[in-house]
């Protein structure tokens, strides 16, 4: 197994797909996806385009769907939800499909959707992702950060490092044996520096500061937790994520 970390979807190799792709958008799309599925959501379907989301979701009965839209950190007008995982309570999401489009996370998912296996990861479900990698041993693994509008994201790289760090620990292989690129080593180093203060890291991150200005303090606290959910979101068909059975 070789791990590759890419800070943004745009940095992934063109005309290639890995055996397993892991999309990361800690703040907040992949944290929300894990939360919805853990709370009993039927599935999460991701879209880059809001008009396409609306058109597809209209084919579902209103009582079986929820629409979540975020642009620039704020909720899209006319949608039931923005991109806060804390709004995704079991009472609201159980048995329903969440149709979601966000500024960054859905773009990363679209880039890797043709991979043989596509997972979503955040700090909150890191252990489930690591367990899958250790059990299945895919030959090539891309961990793709969503970034922010095409640029580097501190929190996504730290989460990639958290995954790689745990794989190294549990496999007892040296990092250089698992690392397919230098970004893996730097991501592990970043996580190692901040692993005891991930909330502090999120506060330093530019997108974390953006969310603090929007008074999303509790979202940052929630998203900074590690291994609190056992759910593994896995793509069942293009853009549709369900829990692994």
Swiss-Prot record:
Q: Which reaction does it catalyse?
A: (2R)-O-phospho-3-sulfolactate + H2O = (2R)-3-sulfolactate + phosphate
Q: Which UniProt keywords apply?
A: Hydrolase, Magnesium
- A Pfam family reported for this protein in Swiss-Prot or TrEMBL: 2-ph_phosp
Q: Which GO terms describe its molecular function?
A: 2-phosphosulfolactate phosphatase activity; magnesium ion binding; sulfopyruvate decarboxylase activity
Q: Which domain of life is it from?
A: Bacteria
The UniProt record lists the EC number as: 3.1.3.71
| Enzyme class, spelled out | hydrolase
Q: Work out whether the entry's keyword set contains Protein biosynthesis.
A: no
Give the protein's cofactors.
Mg(2+)
- Record SUPFAM superfamilies: ComB-like (SSF142823)
Q: Does the keyword Protein biosynthesis apply?
A: no
Q: Which HAMAP family match?
A: ComB
Family, according to the entry, reads as follows:
Belongs to the ComB family.
Entry protein name: Probable 2-phosphosulfolactate phosphatase
Report the source organism.
Trichormus variabilis (strain ATCC 29413 / PCC 7937) (Anabaena variabilis)
């Amino acid at each position: 197994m070789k791990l590759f970390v890419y800070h943004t979807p745009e940095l992934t190799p063109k005309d290639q797909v890995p055996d397993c792709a892991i999309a990361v958008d800690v703040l907040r799309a992949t944290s929300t996806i894990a939360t919805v599925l853990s709370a009993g959501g039927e599935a999460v379907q991701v879209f880059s385009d809001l008009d396409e989301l609306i058109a597809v979701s209209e084919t579902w009965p209103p009582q079986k769907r929820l629409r979540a839209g975020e642009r620039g950190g704020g909720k899209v007008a006319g949608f039931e939800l923005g991109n806060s995982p804390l709004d995704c309570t079991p009472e609201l999401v159980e048995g329903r499909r969440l149709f979601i489009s966000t500024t960054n996370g859905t773009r990363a998912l679209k880039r890797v959707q043709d991979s043989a296996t596509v997972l979503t990861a955040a700090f909150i479900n890191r252990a489930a992702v690591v367990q899958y990698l250790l059990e299945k041993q895919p030959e090539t693994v891309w961990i793709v950060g969503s970034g922010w509008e095409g640029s580097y994201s501190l929190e996504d790289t730290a989460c990639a490092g958290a995954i790689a760090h745990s794989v190294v620990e549990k496999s007892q292989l040296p990092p250089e044996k698992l690392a397919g690129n230098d970004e893996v080593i730097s991501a592990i180093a970043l996580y190692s520096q901040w692993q005891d203060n991930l909330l502090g890291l999120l506060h330093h991150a530019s997108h974390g500061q953006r969310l603090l200005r929007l008074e999303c303090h509790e979202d940052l606290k929630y998203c900074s937790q590690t291994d609190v959910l056992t759910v593994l979101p896995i793509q069942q068909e293009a853009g549709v994520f369900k829990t692994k059975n």
